[in-house]
Amino acid sequence: MENDQFTEKQQQVTTSPTQDNQGQSKAEPVPVSQPLSPTNQTSAQPEMATCDISEELNRQLEDIIKTYGSAASLVEKEGTTAETDKPEKEDVGSMEDAECEDVNEESEKDKPAPGDASRAKEPSASKEQKLEKKILKGLGKEATLLMQSLNKLTTPEEKLDLLFKKYAELLEEHRAEQKQLKYLQKRQAQITKEKDQLQSEHSRAILARSKLESLCRELQRHNKTLKEETIQRAREEDEKRKEITNHFQGTLSEIQAQIEQQSERNMKLCQENTELAEKLKSIIDQYELREEHLDKIFKHRELQQKLVDAKLEQSQEMMKEAEERHQKEKEYLLNQAAEWKLQAKMLKEQETVLQAQITLYSERFEEFQKTLTKSNEVFATFKQEMEKMTKKMKKLEKDTATWKSRFENCNRALLDMIEEKAMRTKEYECFVLKIQRLENLCRALQEERNELYRKIKQAQLPEEVNGNDILEEDDDANTNPSSSEQASIELCAADKNMLQELAEAFRVSHKAEETLPSDGSNPETCNVQMCEAISVPELPSHLTSQPEAGNHCEQFSMSTSAPPEHMPAATENMTTLIENMPKPTKSMPMPPEMVPTPTESVPIPTEGVPTPPKIMPATPESVPTLMQNTSAPLGNMPASTKSTPKAVEHVDDIAELFIPDQPAEQKGDTDMEAVD
């Protein structure tokens, strides 16, 4: 009953828009030569209200479908449950077949043979059978059959075999029953779950039905209001048509009287009127053809409505025959209803468009006489303007092409400038890092120099006390080399050794860095090499007296450059000390010429990149060596053996910064790579 009520409501919903369309087709207006009155404007407002109401109803229906789901989902669920039930039924059937086979085998085994019956008739076994029958009356048929089969056998071994077989069969039956019990328990749980799901779906369906009933009632009310409005509009339009026809007939009679009076003068006007009448006839014919077309469309819609009604009757019969197809038909009908609503909306829109066209034709008919005179002039001016615009368009196209080419060139130049800027920033960072390293080394060497000054002053104090001894030593110095000169020579040798060690350490670090970027694949290591090559300044020529020692002095002076404010002035004794320095022998290690010069691997900075500040100029005045740090009274100073190991230790600490094998250098290299 509920399903029948629902289908009837759907029929009402589907028939209502067709009836509205029929009423509207009957009430279509005739082309009028006057503009719309204020009554037409007021009638447009309820049309908007009806459209809003229909949209709200459609939204409510979509919300119901979304919340309670469509019929397709329910059909899919039923299909899945049916598919799961099929293999379960097959399993149950197989289990029942196996049980039947076991029962048949037992019945065949339990059938007595004729030979056994003859043996049972013996008088010796009759008494025992009576006793066993009394015992087995309470056990049942199975126990009696088992005892009969045991009595038929003679030996106890056969009886034991039979008992073992029977026990094995019973075990198999017991296991099969347990499996079946587990399966039935699972099946029961599934059925309970399905029952809960079906109950929830049933409740949801009831709620959906109640909401759909309320929607149907609202639609019926809406359809009634629409019918009343269409009837009122039809009446108003009929009255307007009558007024327009009366007015038109009066104007025609007046025109005929004027034509009779002034027929000779107004022949030209008659011709124009005939032409206009022909145009009016053509417009009226077109409108009639459109009305006929609309009537055909409405008839087609009525036929479709009849077909839909027939389909609904068939669906009701099918509902009585098979309830399973109810959900599919429900979905089908809902889809059809939505389609019909959309079609009704489209027809309403077409009707409004046609009415607007009719009003436009009426206005154009009034203004047609005025526009004919002005059209030729406007057409000529329009042609001239079009020619001017074509010329302007050609010029603008040329300008756009030139500007596009300029824009592309500017983009390419800008990309090149960005790449150059990135390279220059990397180089600048490398320069800054190297400058910081050199400043740290200069500070360390200044501290060493200050310590040496202190030691020299401490050594000068006992020399002033023993002035006589110093004068004698000066006299002897003219003839033979004194102990102070020997001490100075030893200090020079120690300084040379320190320089060699620093040079070797620096060379080892360069080798380690050159082996890593051999393929040139890592850009970070290549940048580190470029920065290290740039940081090696050139030494003045007067400090490199010997070719082998010159390389060492250049490498050490790179790390000992300091501001010229803290450096002592070079004296005349410097030249004598440099001349007295021993030349390198075969035992001294010669540093390989692997240190890159600043001009070999360093790119020349362009004008756009900021140059680093000139903190350390490589001039003879501002780049002092260890030989310049020695003061004038060094020649008279005795040999101090205690100060050299400390200096060597400090130099070794400085050399550790350059040796890659030690962990401190590894940390420094990693920091440099991170900065690059």
Curated annotation (Swiss-Prot):
Residues 1-55, 71-131, 464-486 are annotated as: Disordered. Residues 75-92, 106-131 have a biased composition (Basic and acidic residues). Residues 157-461 form a coiled coil. Residues 8-25, 34-45 have a biased composition (Polar residues). GO terms for molecular function: syntaxin binding. Residues 93-105 have a biased composition (Acidic residues). InterPro entries: Taxilin_fam. GO terms for cellular component: cytoplasm; extracellular space; sarcomere. Keywords: Coiled coil, Cytoplasm. Pfam families: Taxilin. Specifically expressed in skeletal and cardiac muscle. GO terms for biological process: positive regulation of neuron projection development. The keyword Cytoplasm applies. It is found in: Cytoplasm. Promotes neurite-outgrowth. May be involved in intracellular vesicle traffic. Belongs to the taxilin family. This is Beta-taxilin. It comes from Gallus gallus.
